[in-house]
Amino acid sequence: MKKLIVLLGLAVALSSCEVKSNLYNWGNKSNSKNATEYESSVYNYYHSQSPESLCALLCEYEYMVTHPGGERGVVPPGICAEYGYLLLSPDTPQIFSEHATKRQKERFNSGDYSATFREKGISMLQKEIELYPESAVFIQPLIKKFSQQ
């Protein structure tokens, strides 16, 4: 009887550990180790700070914003804010125009990256507030700062 109770308790404990839900889409699966393109792009950008890694990260953010998935069907928290901030960084348009691949440039479909990135950056910050109103305290000052420039 004791063995049955122990086995039953163990079965309940182990069955409650599995989590199957994905509230958000964190990018495409890129390899057999279950890393995503997003994870790889963020890692590469923050470790190398190269122009190519910035272009790859911008394209991954663009994909995540245009293809939200998961159970909620919305962009994960912070993605729009970080994407918008990167788009509004002063060097981003020039870096993108000089270092992005043809395929990456086609995603943005524009020759004037300065105007496009500025408009899109501000709209991404606004979208972050729309999706996650609690972020307004942090995002509103950024919108104000970049709108005045």
Task: Give the location of each predicted region.
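The tetratricopeptide repeat
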Residues: 79, 138-139
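TPR/TPR-like (Sel1-like) alpha-helical repeat modules
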Residues: 112-135
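N-terminal alpha-helical interaction modules that lie
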Residues: 17-83, 87-108, 114-116, 131, ...
